[in-house]
């Protein structure tokens, strides 16, 4: 009488390992892209926080804090976990249409935040420039970040 065979053969185990390797080859880059996109989205959160400061500065006719700002001013920068957002540009009062750019811009530099060493290597050291519109929203104005990591809320329609 033959005894019952138990377990898997070596070939079956090798096939399973090969399948897992193929799946990992697709999953790891997709996961890295996901992490980079989520970290890049923090820049938009920082920029949204600067909208109020820009609005305050526009009352003085400037995008940025003036040199003689009061002691309560927070400055032209906001530092997050993965990036640094900074206000720049020259206010253009002649623009009145809500979709026009008002001259103010926010430059987000990834990798200069409080956890800069933990930023995805796909966006570390990259910049995203956001142009503020008259209606207060932002649109993409440049930078060297890969377009696939730019948050959808600010992507320019091509």
From Swiss-Prot:
It is a single-pass membrane protein. It holds the Pfam family Pilin. The chain crosses the membrane at residues 8-28. GO terms for cellular component: membrane; type IV pilus. This is Type IV major fimbrial protein FimA. Belongs to the N-Me-Phe pilin family. InterPro entries: N_methyl_site, Pilin, Pilin-like, T4P/T2SS_Core. Gene3D superfamilies: Glycoprotein, Type 4 Pilin. Residues 1-7 form a propeptide. Disulfide bonds join 63-104. Major component of the type IV fimbriae that plays an essential role in twitching motility, natural transformation, and protease secretion. The pili are polar flexible filaments of about 5.4 nanometers diameter and 2.5 micrometers average length; they consist of only a single polypeptide chain arranged in a helical configuration of five subunits per turn in the assembled pilus. The lineage of its organism: Bacteria, Pseudomonadati, Pseudomonadota, Gammaproteobacteria, Cardiobacteriales. Keywords: Disulfide bond, Fimbrium, Membrane, Methylation, Transmembrane, Transmembrane helix. It is found in: Fimbrium; Membrane. It comes from Dichelobacter nodosus. GO terms for biological process: cell adhesion; type IV pilus-dependent motility. It comes from the Bacteria. The modification N-methylphenylalanine is found at residue 8. PROSITE patterns: PROKAR_NTER_METHYL (PS00409).
């Amino acid at each position: 009488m033959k005894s019952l065979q138990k377990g898997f053969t070596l070939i079956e185990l090798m096939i399973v390992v090969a399948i897992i390797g193929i799946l990992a080859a697709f999953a790891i880059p997709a996961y890295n892209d996901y992490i980079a996109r989520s970290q890049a989205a923090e820049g938009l959160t920082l920029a949204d926080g600067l909208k109020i400061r820009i609005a305050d500065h526009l009352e003085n006719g400037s995008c940025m804090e003036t040199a003689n700002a009061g002691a309560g001013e927070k400055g032209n920068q906001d530092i997050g976990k993965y990036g640094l957002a900074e206000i720049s540009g020259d206010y253009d009062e002649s623009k009145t249409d809500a979709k026009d750019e008002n001259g103010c811009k926010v430059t987000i530099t990834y990798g200069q935040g409080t956890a800069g060493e933990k930023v995805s290597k796909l966006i570390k050291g990259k910049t995203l420039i956001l142009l503020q519109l008259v209606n207060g929203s932002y649109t993409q104005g440049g930078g060297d970040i890969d377009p696939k990591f730019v948050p959808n809320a600010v992507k320019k329609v091509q």
